[in-house]
Amino acid sequence: MARVTVEDAVKQVGNRFDLVLVAARRARQLAVQGKEPLVDEENDKPTVIALREIEEGLISNQFMDAQERIEQQQQEASELAAVAALTQDRDYGF
């Protein structure tokens, strides 16, 4: 297990307050949303994995914002496609 220090991760984010927010957000993605870790898990908890990802420069607040925007757009597109399919079925009397 690689040792993770907050100081190393702070250098990537800018300050420790933003680090807490980014790490918590990423740990939640890993633990609750089932996102795949970008580093080896090595039996680490989601918070440690999140800190390791941040320390290695793989995760940032901007990256997660962009990722969430893409997922939101994909969700909206599939909802629109479902509504269009229902509307089309209704128009043809199915």
From Swiss-Prot:
Protein name as it appears in the record: DNA-directed RNA polymerase subunit omega
Protein purpose: Promotes RNA polymerase assembly. Latches the N- and C-terminal regions of the beta' subunit thereby facilitating its interaction with the beta and alpha subunits.
Family recorded in the similarity comment: Belongs to the RNA polymerase subunit omega family.
Cystine residue pairs: none
Catalytic activities: RNA(n) + a ribonucleoside 5'-triphosphate = RNA(n+1) + diphosphate
Highest taxon of source: Bacteria
Gene: rpoZ
Biological source species: Tolumonas auensis (strain DSM 9187 / NBRC 110442 / TA 4)
Keywords recorded for this protein, A-Z: DNA-directed RNA polymerase, Nucleotidyltransferase, Transcription, Transferase
